């Protein structure tokens, strides 16, 4: 898996490509079902051969039921002068997701209970949903709301809520082993970038890179609506769960903030140790949070009956300034941040792929490295052509139980440094793979 | 056990009642045996139906022997002018506890070896005892000592040290379970308040409150002389120890200082976790100390052959300024401190009673809380009518092994918050009691 | 083992004697083999009856082979005026250890690749070796190097590298038990003091002291060349390893720096806890480092196929300013540092010898210490003739599993204080040895 380094080295360039994909997906009005999701999948399929699944409305998925499919053509509020004072075509956040069809004339007072704003941030449109209770509503900025005067308003939501299906995409890469790594992201949010077109685009490019590499583990990429999508996938794939070794949920990975890792519920699972080791040596600031049982789809993967070690590697965590509003737009995206997220995910995968456990074949005292050509020849000086410190750690700890990651932790050294030392020792047959 | 909240809410008022009981008990001259203890028990019995036990002098109790009973009518030192320069009737600390009878005339020089003062605190009378070696003595302030002139002094201790018995009181409340909680305090100190009329009075009122409630656990309240009393009780009740789930020793609970918890010898027993969780959220400063094998009766409960998880929840720990002197008087008592100690003990009992373990009956992914009416209906906003964060913690961790207390610790939330969330989930049949 | 205290009390005087031995050994040119080592052993044998072992060149020792024996009579570089510009007789560091014989005339340019200096410390001669590759070289100060002018130089190394043997010394003291404590030091360094004549001389005097005492454990002292010496010993004594309970490598123990303990690979072995407890109460500053798999012979003892709990108790760790140069000379030695190292090693041995585990024979409640004459007779005061606090800790924790060291840790008390309390309790038959 040294070939992945090529992708890591090109991450800066890839940051731009990820941004371009976000830009292409931005205008589409997505929800947990509907044609917006299908359009999104079509675009992703230009990069990776996503397999599309459609699950019928009414299907029972654990405690939940797949809802009706929602589609929307247009929506507006028009005043008596014929001016659209709220217009879905300007910003699809203006309509509460899953709004039922409406066509009536209402006074301002009648309309007000259906209008939602953020009084404390007067220029942002809030993002609202009502998936499981029939309802309708408009979101708008407080500024626009304040300009509305008494009038008779024509209120139109040209939507449909009918039996249909829930759409999700899946891409599976078979590696040398059946054991698999699960990388998921969610596709249900309309025109917002960090949450979560950034995750969608990042996972697309990670999958694209891995599709060109020979991997030890198998990889599964899941693009599904949040909550109901992961629940649907889990309820249909219980037989596959035994193969999942670890996973990550990708969300909020495109902004300029520092990297932010939310641990699995176990707190010290292999994926936790891997991500934290990568972050420790990443050279920039980061934050690690313990698991909490809300947030994104790690909630479902971590429920006591599923219990998978799934963490979430983000930049600014959900709840950032502008979260779930029109402020989470293309301006909030940062190409360097996207590139760094891409690089970090690849470093994590590099570590997953290379975390082997060896047995020292010369366990009694140190082997004589010099006669094998991997040790300095003049003692006492300070000229160290070989990384003997890392080699000594690997030799000392390779009792068949400690992995290279364990050795990296104990020594305080970067995983790669330990890995390269192990490679050198393996080449001269001082190590055996366990 | 939500009814206990009524007592918690009224703790401020109860603080005053506890103070009144201390005031009533203050003048009595107690020791490890004798009529002062019996008088004390009679007064406590006005509040709770204490069962009184008398254990004969000479009875073997483990390595110890119940000593002779000591009683005292009067004691003084009178100068040649007929003035009582030391008078037991002024303060019963003037006489060393267990002083044998004396009636002789002595010069000052002869008397001096029997006079005890605190040179560094000239206005305090020290509290001294000589239970296990026949001896006699007077305590007085250094100031008074300094005024004594050469003279012939009449020295009188009108005491008796004879076969009799050791008196202790016990009150047992049978709960739903045979498993019991032990709350002990000691009754052997003469006129000193924080050590330990505060403990005696507090436990009286805790027992009074619990006597009116239906409890899950049984409760045993022990009022006995320190050391010899708890040893006596333990030696006579070895068969009961298997039922004791945990316990607390109440002492020094009446002053204005911060709360102070001395852990059990185990350091992380359930009672430790409960008391510390209550303290964490008490809103005021507190201190937690690891176990040390001196102090009060937790020494006996923690001996290697008894090994019970018994901690001690105090305010200013023994050794406070004025400890074991006449300065530990009614002025040292603080009604707010007493009220807060009462409230804290009740909060601990609330937590003991409600610390259940549940099993999530819908373990695969999250259950749909909305369809059960315990979840907000519009997503994305910030209006949270239900405590979904606490509910998510309970659902995520209720695998039949984690108790509500464990969940409270992991989540960082107050125990009550977790408990109420579990109640809500239990009502809609998402949880089963383990 | 209270008799060891006499040696501890005299440590200041012994510091001077250790210094004198260093001074006597300093001029000798040692290497990993050769007559310098033999001469060193002869001098040590004036203090302790060291058994000398000779292992033939060519002997296989695990992955290594005992090298040819190296001896040197003289070496110099002489300019055309007949002046010795580099002279082995002035300082034996001038010749790279294991230099093959040389006799030729060379220009400065031809000679330069064989000259080694420390450019950043112009007045120090570096210490260099080439044990396993035939090579030769001279070390000199940068200052001297800078003075060399173009000339024809006569280059002479009058050495021999021939089949012979590797010499090591061993001294074994049989104690009451077969279980043994291993104390090792290395003898291969030429004229340098802290590294490692300080270790050689210290271990000599520790062995000298123990030879006069009756010990519980057996003690083995090893004086061997670093790396190849300990490997040789280990390969010839595999059957003895099962008896080794713990060990220490003595090196760099003679300077004025603070004490420095490098933990065993286990990190919490008994020797780690003992040394750290001694250091905690030593009254001066110290440092504790986790194990790392380079340094001295603890590397070999800690290899995965040997796995012995061997730490290293030093003062300034290798790598100190002047390390492996001519600056590590007699001026770098400090008699107080030597005395303190000696004292500390003896305190460690005192703790090893006395770390017993007892069973409290009166486990139910506290025993009545007063009736056994080991408790104050008047309660309440502050006169504590007996160390009841330490006795309470011993009684409380002596359940047959906790050692005195465990009790010392839990109580925060010095090991001696706990040991003396246990002695008092043992005398009155309250404890039984486990």
Curated annotation (Swiss-Prot), chains A, B, C:
Zn(2+) binds at residues 189, 195, 324. CDD domains: M28_like. InterPro entries: DUF2172 (IPR032610), DUF4910 (IPR032589), UCP015244 (IPR012353), UCP01524_HTH (IPR032622), WH-like_DNA-bd_sf (IPR036388). Keywords: Carbohydrate metabolism, Metal-binding, Zinc. GO terms for molecular function: metal ion binding. Residues 56-164 are annotated as: Insert. SUPFAM superfamilies: Zn-dependent exopeptidases (SSF53187). Residues 356-434 are annotated as: Permutated winged helix-turn-helix. Binds 1 zinc ion per subunit. It holds the Pfam family DUF4910. Gene3D superfamilies: 3.50.30.90, Winged helix-like DNA-binding domain superfamily/Winged helix DNA-binding domain, Zn peptidases. Its cofactor is Zn(2+). Residues 1-55, 57-355 are annotated as: Aminopeptidase-like. The genomic context suggests a role in the biosynthesis of modified polysaccharides; this association with genes involved in carbohydrate metabolism is observed in several phylogenetically distinct taxa. Is not expected to have peptidase activity despite low similarity to aminopeptidases. Contains an N-terminal region with low similarity to aminopeptidases, an insert domain, and a C-terminal permutated winged helix-turn-helix domain. Homotrimer. Belongs to the UPF0770 family. This is Putative polysaccharide biosynthesis protein with aminopeptidase-like domain.
């Amino acid at each position: 898996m040294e070939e992945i380094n090529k992708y890591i080295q090109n991450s800066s360039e890839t940051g731009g490509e990820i941004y371009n994909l976000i830009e292409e997906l931005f205008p589409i009005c997505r929800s947990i079902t509907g044609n917006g999701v299908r359009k999104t999948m079509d675009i992703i399929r230009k990069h990776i051969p996503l397999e599309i699944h459609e699950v019928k409305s009414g299907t029972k998925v654990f405690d939940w039921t797949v809802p009706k499919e929602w589609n929307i053509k247009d929506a507006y509020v028009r005043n008596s002068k014929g001016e659209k004072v709220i217009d879905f075509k300007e910003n699809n956040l203006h309509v509460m997701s899953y709004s039922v069809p409406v066509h009536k004339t209402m006074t301002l007072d009648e309309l007000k209970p259906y209008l939602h704003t953020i009084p404390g941030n007067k220029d942002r449109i809030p993002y609202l949903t009502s998936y499981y209770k029939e309802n309708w509503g408009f979101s708008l900025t407080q500024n626009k709301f304040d300009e509305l005067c008494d009038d008779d308003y024509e209120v139109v939501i040209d939507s449909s809520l009918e039996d249909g299906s829930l759409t999700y995409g899946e891409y599976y890469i078979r590696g040398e082993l059946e054991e698999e790594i699960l990388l998921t992201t969610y596709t249900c949010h309309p025109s917002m970038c960090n949450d979560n077109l950034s995750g969608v685009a990042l996972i697309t490019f990670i999958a694209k890179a891995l599709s060109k590499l020979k991997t030890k583990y198998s990889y599964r990429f899941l693009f599904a609506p949040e909550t109901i999508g992961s629940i649907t996938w889990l309820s249909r794939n219980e037989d596959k769960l035994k193969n999942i070794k670890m996973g990550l949920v990708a969300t909020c990975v495109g902004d300029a903030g520092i990297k932010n890792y939310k641990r699995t519920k176990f707190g010290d699972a292999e994926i936790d140790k891997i991500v934290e080791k990568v972050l420790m040596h990443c050279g920039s600031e980061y934050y690690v949070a313990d698991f909490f049982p809300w947030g994104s789809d790690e909630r479902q993967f971590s429920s006591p009956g599923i219990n998978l070690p799934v963490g979430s590697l983000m930049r600014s965590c959900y709840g950032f300034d502008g979260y779930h509003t029109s402020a989470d737009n293309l301006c909030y995206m940062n190409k360097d941040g996207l590139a760094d997220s891409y690089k970090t995910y690849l470093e994590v995968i590099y570590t997953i792929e290379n975390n082997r456990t060896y047995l020292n074949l010369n366990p009694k005292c140190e082997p004589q490295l010099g006669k094998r050509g991997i040790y300095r020849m003049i003692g006492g000086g300070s000229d160290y052509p070989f990384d003997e410190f890392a080699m000594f750690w690997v030799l000392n700890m390779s009792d068949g139980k400690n992995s290279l990651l364990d050795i990296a932790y104990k020594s305080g050294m970067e995983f790669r440094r330990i890995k390269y030392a192990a490679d050198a020792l393996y080449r001269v047959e001082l190590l055996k793979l366990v």
